[in-house]
Amino acid sequence: MKIKNVRVYGQDLGTSRPYTIAYKTVSEVINAFVEIELENGIIGIGASNSSKAVVGESVDETLNHLRDVDFSYLIGQKITQTEGLLRQTHDKFTTLPGTHAAIDIALHDAFTQFLNIPLVDYFGQQQRTLPTSITIGIKNIEETLSEADEYYGMGFRFLKVKTGLNPALDAERVIKISERMPEVVLRVDANQGYSTGDLNEFVKRTEKIKLELIEQPFSIGNFIKYVNELHPSIAQLVVADESLRNPKDALQLLKDASGCNIFNIKLMKTGGLLVAKQIAYIAECSKVKLMWGCNDESVVSIAAALHLALSSRSTKFLDLDGSLDLIKDVVTGGFLIKNGMMTLTGKNGLGVQKVS
């Protein structure tokens, strides 16, 4: 069965909840989409929304790149050659992770639909379900508590709070949530906004509450140096996010920042599933815990991440809430969320259905 056609388009999916993190405010959500059609009518879909600040490619640039791609390297090729096609895609777009991700995910979806199996079965499912956290942006205390109440009412028991501007105010927000709902598990994400002094102050102020993890407190350039300056009890909470984009980064972190033993994999950083799977294998061999995160993304790429996350025994944390505040999407399905627990649907490929 051969690839017949490739289509590219962009879509503003909107957001019902604009938010602020340490280095930007988000008020619109544009995703790039790739559809790969086979001769028998099967259509695999991929999506991406990479961050210019993190990987050097914006979604607008992704769309421009995709529209310029000569897809003759795919069209006419057998879908059973997907592994080779994935490597060709990687070689062509190594420095363009958004472009790479959209094509990579579409190939995986088309291939596993052709095989009549869910994508997770192709990888080998290791876990059935895990809780995802849901994120609260940088807000004042009243707004923070209001949003926490809303998510609690929806059944979520893992909350991630964006921080990174002021450790004292950040700590106060987190403490207030813990006091109001002590059974909730709290995570924080400083998005590179702290110095070591800031982080130590934040940890000291929050020492009486239970924090599960702290994502990327330091800038990419200082991450390894600053992690090595932390007390081991603090370093073990730190998650490498923006500092982890590819297997080379993973190996460097293992070598030079051994106190950091949680990696956050995002398909928008790795360029899709092929490279993400390599990082997951490195983590599994090294006893590193995995967290799977996202940007503001279509169900398409969120589902792709969940399929791979549930195929790794090292996966301990999910933060795959990137589609929950979208005003619309181009697909439905992909996964189920009940009381904050994420489960796959058991349908072939990504398990998504195009909205007509």
Q: How would you label these PLM feature ranges?
A:
Residues 111-112, 231, 283, 309:
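A generic structural signal for well-ordered alpha-helical segments
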